[in-house]
């Protein structure tokens, strides 16, 4: 939505999913010719929204030009809502928030969070298939990437 000042809130970078999401963020910046700004990247060490909010709030105070937040988990998305609200930033008007995962907290937030989701049924079936394959003699470890979907809700705006 034309944002150029996009911050990324990650969690536990040593988790593969967190690393992959971080790489996607960096790749998207490059693809859209947006320079990476290290001040727009933080890693929170907890899934606890209130603690995430403290770190996100500090980042927004130090970088008030940020117009969008991408959160690697829905719990950090809740922390982002708290931080923005405390700073008087209107979500969906002054700042956009997009989170990965959902829909656990989607119905509990105001405005509802825009989310990047994955086909859970497809992933579950693939996980079972991979587990069953592990019993075979010539098993080789494998990975599987599923195409994500963006579900746009009230937490984004056009710049």
Annotate each predicted stretch with a short phrase:
Residues 1-32, 142-156:
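An alpha-beta-alpha
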Residues 2-5, 35, 65, 112:
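Short loop/turn motifs at secondary-structure junctions
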Residues 4-5, 36-40, 91-96:
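Short acidic capping loops at alpha-helix termini that bridge into adjacent secondary structure
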Residues 7-8, 26-50:
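Short beta-strand elements in bilobed, periplasmic/extracellular small-molecule ligand-binding domains
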Residues 9-12, 42, 72, 101:
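Conserved residues at the C-terminal ends of beta-strands
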Residues 17, 47-48, 72, 97:
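A generic short alpha-helical patch detector that favors 3-5-residue windows
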Residues 17-21, 48-52, 120:
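Conserved donor sugar-nucleotide recognition element shared by glycan-biosynthetic enzymes
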Residues 53-159:
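Flexible loop/turn connectors
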């Amino acid at each position: 939505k034309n944002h150029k000042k996009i911050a990324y809130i990650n969690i536990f970078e040593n988790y593969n999913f967190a690393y992959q999401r971080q790489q996607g963020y960096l790749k998207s910046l490059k693809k859209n010719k947006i320079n990476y700004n290290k001040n727009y990247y933080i890693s929170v060490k907890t899934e606890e929204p209130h603690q995430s909010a403290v770190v996100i709030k500090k980042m927004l105070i130090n970088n008030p030009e940020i117009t969008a937040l991408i959160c690697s988990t829905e719990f950090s998305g809740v922390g982002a809502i708290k931080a923005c609200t405390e700073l008087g930033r209107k979500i969906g008007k002054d700042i956009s928030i997009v989170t990965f995962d959902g829909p656990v907290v989607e119905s509990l937030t105001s405005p509802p969070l825009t989310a990047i989701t994955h086909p859970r049924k497809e992933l579950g079936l693939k996980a079972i298939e991979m587990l069953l394959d592990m019993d075979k003699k010539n098993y080789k470890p494998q990975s599987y990437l599923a195409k994500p979907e963006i579900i746009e809700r009230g937490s984004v705006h056009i710049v």
